[in-house]
């Protein structure tokens, strides 16, 4: 049996990670996501190169929360490397980490221009399902890397186990 509550929490957290990674890249001049870990109650993202101050963290969370209050669709599709690279810079998608022999990739896309990234994970279908993003800590991981930990507030809408929108 699938624990729907836990699965759905992971879907929300994972989508929030994509959102935060995409926003951080745009807001902070190409900062990259170099690691992440998704849990059902909190998650973390490692960014590099960056040294966040509180103003920067506030800007990141407020930008994320502005979007999670909007009905922005999240889709999955199969794309070629060339199609992905034509839309997003290779360093943003971490395409260099994938074997060159992999030609077609599953991608998650948030809205038209929020984020597009190769990913085989599970995600919600709309940003309104994520809830508010609350950054709860930051920690230096050395060599210009900072770890940001976040949790999520209640979403505007949810999906029940039988896929009804509530």
What is the meaning of each model-derived region?
Residues 1-166:
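Active-/binding-site microenvironments in catalytic and ligand-binding cores
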